[in-house]
Amino acid sequence: MSVTVSSPAGRSFHISRSPYKKISKPRVIIAAVRSGVSLAVAPILTKLQKDCATPLPVLRHVADAMAVDMRAGLAVDGGSDLKMILSYIDTLPTGNEKGLFYALDLGGTNFRVLRVQLGGKEERVIATEFEQVSIPQELMFATSEELFDFIASELGKFSQSEGGKFEMQQGRTREIGFTFSFPVKQTSVKSGILIKWTKGFAVSGTAGKDVVACLNEAMERQGLGMQVSALVNDTVATLAGARYWDNDVMVAVILGTGTNACYVERVDAIPKLPQRMSNSPETIVNTEWGAFSNGLPLTEFDREMDAESINPGEQIFEKTISGMYLGEIVRRVLVKMAKVGGLFGGGYVPEKLVTPFVLRTPDICAMQQDTSRDLEAVESVLYDIAGVKSDLSARKTVVDICDTIANRGGRLAGAGIVGILQKMEEDSKGVIFGKRTVVAMDGGLYEHYPQYREYLQEAVTELLGSEISKNVVIEHSKDGSGIGAALLAAANSKYEHDY
C-alpha cells in the first residue's frame, strides 16, 4: 500500500508566518477625491456578498461533494482531493485506563510535555501537569541527534519532578503519546517517516527516518525509562481526548490558523485498507479536509490570494474557512474599495494596507465584536493596522465585509461537518442521525470568534433540519489534543491488560 502524507492542522489563532511568495508591494495609488463614498463602494460590497452567498442549495452541494470525495479517498490513495489518511489508531480510550502517562506535543518553536494520572472508571483523570519549553534557535538548524537529545533531556527533567498525585507503578516503563505536527508518513500506531521539516526547521539527518525511533533512541541515550506508544496528529488526539469523556464523540474538527477533521470509520468501509491490518471493527481516519475544493463559492479576492500563495490551486477549503486566511481576504477587499471607491476618503490606498497579512483574523474578529455607537474598536484597528482615520460610514462598511467573510467561512465549515456525518449515516442508517452524536471542536478560530461559531451551527441546523439536528451536538473540546495524546498512549499501552 502506498502511504499518504499527513500534515497538521493549526490550533493557534496566531499567524506566525505568511504563506505567500515574496511579491513586489503594490504601489500606493492616489485617486481623485469622491463625494458619497458609500455609493462608490456599494457595488463592490454587493458583488462580494453575492459571490460569498451560501444559501441552502450551495451548502447541500458542498456537503454532498464532501461525502463523495471521502468515499473516493477511502477507495484508493489519490482517489480524490481528500487524502483520507489511516491513523492506525484502532483502540480509543474507554475510561478504564489506569496509571501515569505522558504526552509530547512538538509542532513549532515550542514544545509541550504533559503527564496525566488516570484512575479508571471511578476516578478518571486524577491529576494533570504540563510544561512548555522553547527550542533554542540554533537547534532548529542542528542535527537530528542534537534536537531530539534536547527534547529527551527536557522530558527527563519533567519526569524527575513527579510527585504528589503522580505515581509510576514499579517496574513499568513510562509511555508517551507523541503529537508530531510536521508532514509524516504514518506506518503504524507508533511509527512514522518524516517527509520534511517545515515552520522554519532545517534539522539535518532526519528526513526519511522514523521520528518515533529518533525520539526513543534519544531517550535511551539520556538513560530515561520512557518510550513512545502512540504517534498521532493533533486532530486525532482531539478526538481521543473528547471521546474519553463522552462515548458519543464521532468526529473532531480543528478550526484555528489551519483546519482539519477526523472521524471514527468502520474498517469494512475502507477499501484501500490492507487485509488483516486491523482486528478492530473501527479506526480513526484523518480526512485532511483543507484540500477539498468542490463547488465552493469563491470571489475574485480568493482567486487572487490563491494565485499569489506558495501553493496555488491547493488547500482551497482551508483558504476559505481557516484563521490563516480570513483576515487576508478582508484586507484584499479593503484595498480594492480604497482604490476604486475611495473608502477611506481622500481617494488613496493606505500604504500599510497593501502589505499581505497585515490584517489578521483576530483583528476582524475584534472589529465584529464592536457594539459601540461610533464603532470605536473598528476605528482603532483600522488606524493601528492601516494607519488612517476612518469615518463612521467606512467603519460600517468594514464590519459588513468582516461579517460576509466570517459568514461564508462558518457556514462552509458547517457544511463540511454535515458531509462527514452524512457519509457515516449513509453507511449505517441510524448510527449518526438516529441517536446523540457529538462533534468535538478545538482551535482558536472556533473558540474566540462567536459569530463564526453561530454561522457554523446555523448551517448544520439548516442542512439537517430542526429534528435531526437536535441529535447532533457540536461542542468545544478545549485543548483536547494535549491530554488526548496521553490517553492514546494509555489506550495503546503494552500494559493494557494489567488494569
Curated annotation (Swiss-Prot):
Entry protein name: Hexokinase-2, chloroplastic
TM stretches of this protein: none
Expression across tissues: Expressed in vascular starch sheath, xylem parenchyma, guard cells and root tips.
Main location group: plastid
Annotated function: Fructose and glucose phosphorylating enzyme.
Domain Hexokinase: 39-490
Entry binding sites for D-glucose: 198-199, 233-234, 260, 288, 318
UniProt-listed InterPro entries: ATPase_NBD, Hexokinase, Hexokinase_C, Hexokinase_N
Compartment annotation: Plastid, Chloroplast stroma
Organism: Nicotiana tabacum (Common tobacco)
Record-listed ADP binding positions: 108-110, 257, 444
Region (Hexokinase small subdomain): 94-232
Similarity remark: Belongs to the hexokinase family.
Reaction catalyzed: a D-hexose + ATP = a D-hexose 6-phosphate + ADP + H(+); D-fructose + ATP = D-fructose 6-phosphate + ADP + H(+); D-glucose + ATP = D-glucose 6-phosphate + ADP + H(+)
GO terms classed as biological process: glucose 6-phosphate metabolic process; glucose metabolic process; glycolytic process; intracellular glucose homeostasis
Pathway the protein takes part in: Carbohydrate metabolism; hexose metabolism; Carbohydrate degradation; glycolysis; D-glyceraldehyde 3-phosphate and glycerone phosphate from D-glucose: step 1/4
Record carries keyword Signal: no
Name of the gene: HXK2
PROSITE patterns named among the record's database cross-references: HEXOKINASE_2 (PS51748)
Top EC group: transferase
Region described as Hexokinase large subdomain: spans on this chain: 233-479
Keywords: ATP-binding, Chloroplast, Glycolysis, Kinase, Nucleotide-binding, Plastid, Transferase, Transit peptide
